[in-house]
Amino acid sequence: DGNIVIDSRNDKVWPMTWYGTVIKNDGKTGFVNRKGEYVIRPGDYDVGDLDEINGLLVLKDGKTGKSGIFSVETGQQVIPFRYDGITFAGSDRLVVEKNGVRSLYNMRTGYSVFSVSTDMTIDPFLHDRLTWVHQGSSNYEVINDQGQILFADKEGLIEEARPFSHGYSAVKAKGKWGIMDA
């Protein structure tokens, strides 16, 4: 319709989502709905991941450096600022970091299903119920969404791996690419 929903006086405006968008102005960050109304009041936050499926936003408290999660529908804080880091790892999984431990959580139950040290990476579950866990470009393992290790590269042959799709992943070993299943 050509109506201005959010005026152009802000320091930064993120791309619009189904729920609305993040706005930063005068050093304060908030979330507004598609009508331009604040859902999450401006505060001293850094912006993290946005889960557009579940309407959740990771914000890091600028004073404590701890991360929490807010609902972008209601503005309610659903996970307090207590974690060193939070990333969404799929439609019902998230990865949290606290005290040198990186844990994969089931968002429905609230329970950790897998944990490693923070020098390891837990890749997101994109279009599958499988993902890679690795330490840089080594120590590759495949886990399912329940945290069970299905494969471990004990010989250290894998140099790089792509996300799983339909149970298969592109994998680089000895400088060449191939496809493997879990």
Regions found by a protein language model. Give the residues of each.
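Residue-level detector of conserved, function-critical positions
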Residues: 1-182
